[in-house]
Amino acid sequence: MSLATETTDLVGPFRSPHNTAAEAKGSIHDDATATKLGFKGGTVAGSLHMDQFVPQLVEIYGGEWWRKGNLSLYFRQATVHGEAVRTFARRGSPHARLWMENEAGDLIMEGTASCSGSDPDSELTHRLKGQATADPGALRILAKNKVGDEAKDVALKVTRAGLEQRLKTVPEAMPEYSGDQPFLPPSMQVALFRAAQENIIKLSGRAVGLFGAIELQSINGPPRAETDYAGRFKILALSESPKTENIWYQAWAADPKTGEDVASMVMYLRFMKASSDLWN
């Protein structure tokens, strides 16, 4: 059943995103691996769905959203290649409420957006406060990590070729994604940080991971393609559930010349215990 109740809700069109990582064997995006772990098929990365919200955010906040905007989403249900979904946005203060539904009205993700700098009550800030710390010895996949671990001076960059590859399947094309200094859509902002993730997360053995939630914050944005950034990372929390081991980390991208932060990301990753030999 849809959550849309107000005539002022902004409703996007149904889009059917591509599972662009379907050929990544052994990942959650691979049909064989995903179905073995109980999913209905290889999953579409939640970061790809984030691009669908951009037209509504620009309608609510104008072009300033690219410079100071926040997008914070918690992923409720995975989708598969070609599954139709649409976005909803409800204006509000201090932030707008966002969610995504499939054609059956199932909730795919929910969260917040704002345009006044860091949001102290964003979706992920709220959820991070409720995280119970894993007991000592409870983690196996993530046993080598600890809260407060950091990585600094990490080179970050998205090439124009990488951006152009994404734009072949982006669900909502925006003029800002082209030109001499193209903006990065949310999915490619995530890719900017994720490409260097091994600098902060140390896995014991192999395990299949999936996105649990992502928050993007433009500080002096937007981040752009073909631009060098200096990255730093910090682990915020470690937790576990009967099925997963979980890690929260934050990453920042700064101008290497001035040291001024351009953008940041908070990432919540879940690693499936059933995918690890350490749990079987």
Q: Could you tell me what each predicted segment is?
A:
Residues N70-F75, A213-N220, I235:
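Short structured motifs
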Residues S2-K68, P120-E215, S276-N280:
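Hot-dog-fold acyl-thioester-processing enzymes
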Residues M1-R15, V80-N145, N220-N280:
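HotDog/MaoC-like acyl-thioester-processing domains
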Residues N70, H95, F211-A213, W248:
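Short coil/loop residues immediately preceding or within conserved phosphate-binding loops
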Residues G42, S72, A78-V80, P222:
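Residue-level "contact hotspot" at macromolecular interaction interfaces
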